[in-house]
């Protein structure tokens, strides 16, 4: 089972989030490290979740929470767990957590 844990840059998992962020997304699809840290710590509408499975870090999700929807901005898992249904499980957990619709942007496989 996956656990969603809200984190900030001072939390232990954040270094793993930063590393995966840098390997899972090209530079043009992410903020600078400094800007990402700032929005994570200072913007009350921006949420970073570490994804843990049996106590091990397996990925992260970043979201913008608005009054009418939650926008899932970045979502990545470590290579070892890809294709094992974690993405569906995480989206289900997010849908249970929020009373407003989730909005996702899908990028084609050519970019993965």
Residue ranges of predicted features:
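Short amphipathic alpha-helix that is part of the acyltransferase structural core
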Residues: 1-35
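A structural micro-motif
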Residues: 2, 46, 100-101
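Active-site rim helix/loop that mediates acceptor-substrate recognition in acyltransferases
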Residues: 24-54
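Conserved beta-strand in the GNAT
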Residues: 50, 55-65, 69-76
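Conserved acetyl-CoA-binding loop-helix of GNAT-fold acetyltransferases
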Residues: 77, 83-96
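Conserved GNAT acetyl-CoA-binding A-motif
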Residues: 97-111
């Amino acid at each position: 089972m996956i656990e969603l844990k809200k984190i900030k840059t001072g939390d232990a998992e954040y270094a793993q989030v930063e590393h995966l962020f840098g390997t899972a997304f090209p530079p043009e699809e992410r903020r600078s490290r400094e800007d990402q840290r700032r929005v994570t710590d200072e913007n009350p509408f921006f949420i970073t979740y570490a994804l843990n499975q049996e106590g091990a870090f397996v990925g992260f999700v970043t979201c913008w929470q608005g009054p009418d929807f939650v926008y899932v901005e970045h979502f990545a898992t470590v290579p070892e767990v890809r294709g094992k249904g974690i993405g569906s499980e995480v989206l289900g957990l997010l849908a249970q957590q929020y009373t407003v619709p989730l909005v996702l942007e899908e990028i084609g496989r050519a970019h993965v």
